[in-house]
């Protein structure tokens, strides 16, 4: 039995999809455990670029099981569209399994999400307006509708009727928007469910059976630790738990069955949406990193905010997710920058702090304490191993490992699978 969790250590968009795809080659099951179609990941497979939002990266390996876990919230319409997108590209999806316990996103969730962001104005969270938060709210309030409910038309109708009474009052009286009629949703969404019903099962059984049979299972996190609803920059966070602890809740696999946790980090830092960002760059270096790194959101197309690598953030991620390994991505983007900076601590009211503050008010007042390192000019996109990297690049990686307290077991120097390199296997048994 061997299991690996892949988590983002920053604010998402770290390259988790690429690393998950790379590690999938040696896995026999790949599972997502939280989030929904608010998270986009880009994968290159057999020379073709794919952009997925719901379906796990392992879908391209027809001999491997791909799982949408119970901790996810699934937009049935988006799922059907993504399946069609893959089928149109000739991808076989018969290896997909969808948890019967996963909750679904309905049109009223999306409308409420949009209206709430609009109402908040300058205080908006910066959501993707995909209905994720409202769907998780319904789950916590115990009025959510699960995939198992969607497949039974009588149950679906009963729950939908009940919810529409409440949601329409909210939309019409509070947001002053038009509500929904039962017939606007019932038949259309029931039909979506019928289109993917053959994939639906108890995925906890599937995953535990795989582990008990000695198979390798890979858990794919979405977003990142700093967007975790408990451990992130609350309230500028997502509505679920991307940290490694979310695996046990969102997949139905116990913590004793998790072996290694791989934290994926960019060689710099990015963020989409609002909230404090201590190392954010507003100069030409930031612009260069954004353009060279193609830093635009997969889901929204929004330009990402760019900053220097923040070891305070990744140390926090190490602690709350129990990182055993670090995968450093987009090293090639930093090529040509004469002097690189790593944030080693913050200054808050004249005092140096080395741990990430819980208070956003404090975080907004934090000034980064930087350590400067010489950059490199050599093209690193064709290197085949750690030893091939320029000395300054290796020193940069070594310093990150020292400051974060996590060994760098993988690094990538470009978008292709062949540009990801292993220093130490994360599938090791010890």
Curated annotation (Swiss-Prot):
Q: Which cofactor does it need?
A: Mg(2+)
One CC-aspect GO term = cytoplasm
Query: For Mg(2+), which residues are the binding ones?
Result: 13, 40
Binding residue positions for IMP: 13-16, 38-41, 128, 142, 223, 238, 302
Q: Give me the comment on cofactor binding.
A: Binds 1 Mg(2+) ion per subunit.
The metabolic or biological pathway listed in the UniProt record of this protein is: Purine metabolism; AMP biosynthesis via de novo pathway; AMP from IMP: step 1/2
What is its subcellular localisation?
A: Cytoplasm
- The UniProt entry annotates the active site at 13, 41
Q: Which reaction does it catalyse?
A: IMP + L-aspartate + GTP = N(6)-(1,2-dicarboxyethyl)-AMP + GDP + phosphate + 2 H(+)
Signal recorded as keyword: no
Do you know which SMART domains this protein is assigned to? Adenylsucc_synt
Name the positions where GTP binds.
12-18, 40-42, 304, 330-332, 412-414
Mainly resides where?
cytoplasm
Which GO molecular function terms does the record list?
A: adenylosuccinate synthase activity; GTP binding; magnesium ion binding
The protein's superkingdom reads Bacteria
What UniProt keywords apply to this chain's record, in alphabetical order?
Answer: Cytoplasm, GTP-binding, Ligase, Magnesium, Metal-binding, Nucleotide-binding, Purine biosynthesis
PROSITE patterns in the record, alphabetically?
ADENYLOSUCCIN_SYN_1 (PS01266), ADENYLOSUCCIN_SYN_2 (PS00513)
EC number from the UniProt entry: 6.3.4.4
Q: Which GO terms describe its biological process?
A: 'de novo' AMP biosynthetic process; IMP metabolic process
- NCBIfam families, per this entry? PRK01117.1 (NF002223), purA (TIGR00184)
Family label: Belongs to the adenylosuccinate synthetase family.
Subunit structure of this chain's protein: Homodimer.
Role of this protein: Plays an important role in the de novo pathway of purine nucleotide biosynthesis. Catalyzes the first committed step in the biosynthesis of AMP from IMP.
- What is this protein's record name? Adenylosuccinate synthetase
